[in-house]
A protein has these predicted regions:
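Membrane-interface helix-loop junction between the first two transmembrane segments
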Residues: 6, 42-58
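Canonical alpha-helical transmembrane segments of integral membrane proteins
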Residues: 32-42, 115-123
Length: 180
């Protein structure tokens, strides 16, 4: 998503800075909340006295949704508190830096791809009558999107650090000569 926002050569010219920074923060809140939900549910399931009846998949989806909502609320308040009264250039600078960072753009691509894939799978399951997360209503769909964002983040980490060794392919700059 980040790569679709306009990106200027200079930070002070960056448009949509509030939207860019808020979108970034809320997207990270979805992934963080889902990870917290997955960890809490896994711990509860591993301790027999805390284990509740019901399918694990439902517990994971609902826990991911609940923790995503809580995390998004906390992070939203944190963003407001952190950026309250800041000059527009500070919003522009932070947004510009996000758009300038190739790793951040790649993380966003993978995260949104994971969310989209999970939502597509949820929709297909619902259309085919297989149930899936959609049978839990909006909470199941939101949980699927959150877990998809975690899957996308894991895919990004495997791609960037496993396959590519953490390095980016360097692009030739116009006017630069390659080595002798």
């Amino acid at each position: 998503m980040s790569r679709y926002f306009p990106h200027t050569p200079y930070a002070e010219d960056q448009p949509l800075s509030h939207v860019i920074l808020t979108t970034h923060v809320l997207t990270r809140a979805v992934t963080t909340g889902s990870i917290i939900g997955l960890i809490l549910t896994s711990v509860r399931q591993s301790i027999p006295s805390l284990r509740r009846p019901g399918p694990l998949s439902e517990k994971l989806l609902l826990s991911a949704t609940r923790n995503t909502i809580i995390t998004t609320a906390i992070v939203g308040v944190g963003l407001t508190a952190r950026m309250w009264g800041r000059e527009p250039i500070e919003w522009q600078d932070r947004s510009w830096r996000l758009l300038e960072n190739r790793g951040q753009l790649e993380t966003d691509d993978w995260t949104y791809g994971g969310m989209g894939g999970a939502l597509l799978a949820t929709g297909l399951m619902g259309v085919r009558g297989a149930g899936g997360p959609a049978r839990l209503g909006w909470r199941g769909v939101a949980g699927a999107a959150g877990i998809g964002s975690v899957g996308g983040m894991i895919g990004y980490m495997a791609w960037r650090y496993g396959i590519n060794g953490g390095k980016f392919v360097e692009k030739d700059k116009k006017g630069e000569r390659k080595g002798i």
